[in-house]
């Protein structure tokens, strides 16, 4: 009898450190360059997914899980993909603010952020005429300490300019694609083809499901138990033909300025949606993933959700 694998069946936390690295890339804490690799797979349980995100050439690898809410027939066991993106934006910006404040000798006693990211789609994804769009992120930064408002404003602006996460929303990217079937690379005809060497076959790279390192943190991703008021409403097409379907994600980030850890709570702004908390870290102790790692996971999870929805529709 076939075994149905799911997020719950492993018994593992929703997020954990999978592989210990020797050093984090410089881009996590300041200026520099780093290549983040996100490898994801789809569970047999509908929208459930897991990803391994490796932070740079010598950084640690983190396993994260994602699911969708009941409104699109998910199981609501783990954060939704767009929530990872929202949390990654805030966590990366918070780290830049903290780091620059320390470098400038500015004392902050507290640092919190809030962020709303919006997305819309017109047309039909399944009919091939869907057009997606992202709204500008609305971010509020709150700081306390013996710092003049003008100096704090300048500090935040400098952090915004230094954030690779926020740059992903302001600078156009030329995306390329590669396709593999049964371990063999196939030609890409419609989308821009990647010129990079072939990626390793994940079925050969991972002989067993990822498991937590001994002693690793178990609260990197948790479901808080808080839900938005109102009954869950199953997603339906737009009421008017051609009208956009709009979704907003709300997040709140609190940073421990002493440790460098941040906790970001995210929720989709729809009735009945669940809140999740994601922890990040930027200090040398490497206790939790970086904001850039969350951002990377969010991108690959979004792709997998749309791919699985298309597979369902086409009955493949």
What are these regions (language model features)?
Residues 89-93, 302-303:
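Alpha-helical metal-binding/catalytic segments enriched in His/Glu/Asp
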């Amino acid at each position: 009898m076939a075994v149905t694998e799911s997020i719950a069946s492993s018994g593992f936390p929703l997020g954990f450190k999978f592989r210990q690295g020797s050093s984090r890339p410089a881009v996590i804490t300041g200026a520099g360059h780093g290549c983040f690799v996100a490898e994801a797979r789809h569970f047999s349980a509908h929208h459930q997914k897991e990803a391994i995100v490796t932070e740079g050439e010598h950084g640690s690898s983190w396993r994260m899980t994602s699911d969708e809410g009941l409104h699109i027939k998910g199981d609501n066991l783990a954060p939704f993909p767009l929530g990872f993106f929202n949390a990654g934006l805030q966590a990366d910006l918070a780290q830049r603010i903290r780091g620059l404040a320390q470098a400038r000798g500015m004392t902050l006693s507290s640092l919190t952020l809030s962020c709303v990211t919006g997305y819309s789609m017109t047309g039909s994804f399944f009919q091939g005429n869907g057009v997606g769009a992202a709204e500008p992120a609305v971010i509020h930064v709150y700081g306390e300490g013996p710092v003049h408002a003008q100096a704090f404003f300048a500090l935040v602006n400098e952090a915004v300019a230094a954030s690779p996460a926020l740059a992903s929303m302001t600078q156009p990217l030329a995306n390329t694609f590669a396709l593999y079937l049964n371990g063999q690379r196939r030609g890409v005809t419609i989308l821009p083809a990647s010129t990079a060497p072939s990626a390793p076959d994940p079925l050969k790279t991972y002989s067993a499901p990822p498991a937590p390192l001994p002693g690793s943190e178990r609260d990197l991703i948790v479901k808080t138990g808080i839900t938005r008021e109102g009954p869950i409403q199953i997603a339906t097409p737009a009421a008017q033909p051609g009208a956009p379907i709009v979704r907003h994600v709300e997040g709140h980030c609190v940073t421990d300025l002493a440790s460098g850890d941040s906790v970001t709570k995210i929720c989709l702004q729809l009735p009945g949606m669940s809140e999740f908390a994601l922890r990040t870290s930027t200090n040398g102790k490497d206790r939790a993933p970086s904001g850039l790692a969350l951002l990377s996971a969010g991108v690959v999870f979004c792709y997998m959700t749309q791919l699985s929805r298309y597979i369902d529709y086409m009955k493949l």
